[in-house]
A protein has these predicted regions:
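N-terminal pre-catalytic segment of deacetylase/amide-hydrolase enzymes
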Residues: 1-63, 268-271
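Metal-dependent polysaccharide deacetylase catalytic core of the NodB/CE4 family, i.e.
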Residues: 5, 10, 15-16, 60-63, ...
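Short catalytic/ligand-binding loop motif for oxyanion handling, primarily in non-cytosolic enzymes
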Residues: 18-20, 52-53, 73-75, 97-103, ...
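Generic structural signal for well-ordered alpha-helices
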Residues: 29-33, 50, 79, 132-136, ...
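His/Asp/Glu-enriched short active-site or ligand-binding loop at hydrolase and phosphoryl-transfer sites
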Residues: 43, 50, 151-155, 178-189, ...
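Extended catalytic core of nucleotide-activated donor transferases of GT-like folds
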Residues: 44-47, 63-66, 71-79
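Extended, intrinsically disordered, low-complexity segments
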Residues: 235-272
Length: 272
């Protein structure tokens, strides 16, 4: 089997029966995972991603599964499917929204994305976000890794009246890192930017805090030559057929398409 020249990274948020922004239905999500598993795609670990960017080898059909924010449906809808097909995934946590409490053995259908936002505004994040107990349960399976999505998910550069956005960003990332260390015993070197937005100063700050793999919402070929500071991701769609996913993975693993992808960067969605 030949080696991977580019690593496609799939970006998910919600998997729910309630349609809406950044949401796939359980049926579509399971169909995509079944197709990946049945087509011989290898879902990679964080350590394998780091080695890839250092020049290490991955099988040609390698893909990374990422989920942003830490929604409760990642526990109730995503995790059972990952177990069913033996797939590895990564969840970027907004650590300031993750609560305490026992594992929820039964979860009724979760709200839509807009409804989830309203719960959070009302101080009821626990109704729609993961708990540390559920995170530990998923982590112990060996199938799910957890990384930082900052502590607050704020775009400090857009906050009115803020004169020191870089200092606040540094504190935000640092607080997330320390919270993950306190609750999970460690924090990885992987960080996802809120709304996918970044610039060179952000990259510098993240590096100073120990983060080496930085995730965006841009469409790009991910190769060792491009480095791990601007990892692009493919925003997933609610499509019945696996053909859409097959075409996307072909494009993002075929070097001839790299120049085209560079001209068409993906949209930066709210709550990424």
């Amino acid at each position: 089997m030949s080696d991977a020249r580019s690593l496609p990274v799939l970006m998910y948020h919600h998997v729910s029966n309630k349609p809406g922004l950044v949401t796939l239905s359980p049926h579509t999500f399971r169909s995509q995972m079944r197709w990946l598993a049945g087509s011989g795609w290898k879902t990679v670990t964080a350590a394998e991603v780091e080695l890839f960017y250092l020049g290490g080898k991955l099988p040609r059909k390698s893909v990374m599964l990422t989920f942003d924010d830490g929604w409760l449906d990642n526990w109730s809808q995503v995790f059972p499917v990952l177990r069913e097909f033996g797939l590895h995934a990564h969840i970027f946590l907004i650590t300031g929204l993750i609560g305490d409490g026992p594992v929820r053995e039964r979860v009724d259908d979760t709200p839509s994305h807009r409804e989830c936002e309203e719960y959070i505004k009302q101080g009821l994040a626990d109704n729609v976000m993961l708990r540390w107990s559920e995170i530990r349960e998923m982590r112990s399976s060996g199938l799910v890794e957890f990384h930082s999505h900052t502590h607050t998910h704020r775009r400090w550069d857009l906050m009115p009246g803020i004169t020191n956005p870089l200092e606040l960003l540094r504190a935000d990332i640092l607080l997330s890192r320390e919270r993950m260390k306190d609750m999970l015993g460690s924090c990885s070197r992987h960080l996802c930017w809120p709304e996918g937005w970044y610039h060179p100063d952000y990259i510098r700050i993240a590096g100073e805090l120990g983060f080496t793999c930085l995730y965006t919402t841009e469409r790009r070929m991910n190769t060792p030559q491009h480095g791990a500071c601007q990892i692009g991701r493919i925003s997933t769609k609610e499509r019945e057929s696996s053909g859409w996913l097959k075409r996307r993975l072909f494009c993002y693993t075929t070097p001839v398409f790299s120049s085209l992808l560079a001209l068409h960067k993906g949209p930066r969605l709210s709550w990424n």
